[in-house]
A protein has these predicted regions:
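A structural signal for short, well-ordered beta-strand segments
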Residues: 1, 12-14, 158-164
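Flexible loop/turn segments at secondary-structure boundaries
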Residues: 2-4, 17-18, 32-34, 136-138, ...
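Acidic (Asp/Glu-rich), glycine- and aromatic
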Residues: 2-27, 172
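A short linear-motif detector with a strong N-terminal bias
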Residues: 3-5, 69-73, 82-84, 106-110, ...
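A general secondary-structure signal for short beta-strands and their flanking turns/coil
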Residues: 7-11, 87, 157-159
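Active-site/ligand-binding surface loops and adjacent short beta/alpha elements
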Residues: 17-103
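Active-site pocket scaffolds in enzymes
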Residues: 90-174
């Protein structure tokens, strides 16, 4: 806005295709990704979905694997908060097949939150192995309560940078 401050939330949406049995890894410590506990209004929990959530919380389902994730409908969402505590940059990978990896890297001061969003049904097969964000995808009020809502001064701008792509087996990512 040219005349008043405005709130800002930004999530870089990259919905990579769901590849059965893919493995994900990240520069974060084990356990940094946690299952989202809130249930958004657009999600209608089924018995199977509730059981999947219980299995995730019990450690029976690996947050870094798509093995068995064909049952993730509605979506299963993981979040990692306060990424700057883990370093200046964060890197995430999804090994799609023996021949290549998807990779995403970003600065944690720009994106202090990461979301992993997985959905598999007849219409959508998505493995968003990382969605860099300024806040969780739970809306403005939740971001404000968490202290992650950005307020831009009138006329101010903000720039974000994400590097993502596909690497062949053995190819370096610099």
């Amino acid at each position: 806005s040219k005349y008043q401050s405005m709130p800002l939330q930004y999530i870089c949406h990259m919905n990579y295709a769901f590849i059965p049995e893919a493995r994900m890894s990240q520069s974060l410590p084990d356990g940094a990704f946690q299952l989202r506990r809130s249930v958004p209004n657009h999600v209608a929990p089924t018995r199977q979905w509730l059981r999947i959530n219980e299995d995730i919380l019990a450690g029976k389902i690996d947050a870094d694997s798509l093995v068995g994730a064909e049952a993730f409908d509605p979506e299963i969402v993981y979040v990692a908060d306060d990424l700057p505590q883990y370093g200046k940059t964060a890197e995430f990978r999804m090994q799609a097949r023996a021949h290549h990896n998807f990779v995403t890297r970003f600065r944690t001061d720009q994106f202090p939150v990461a979301t992993r969003w997985i959905l598999h049904n007849a219409d959508q097969r998505v493995a968003a192995y990382v969605l860099p964000g300024t806040s969780r995808p739970e809306g403005r009020l939740a971001a404000e309560a968490a202290g992650t809502l950005i307020h831009l001064d009138a006329g101010a701008t903000r720039t974000f940078s994400v590097t993502t792509g596909l690497l062949a087996q053995g190819e370096a990512f610099d």
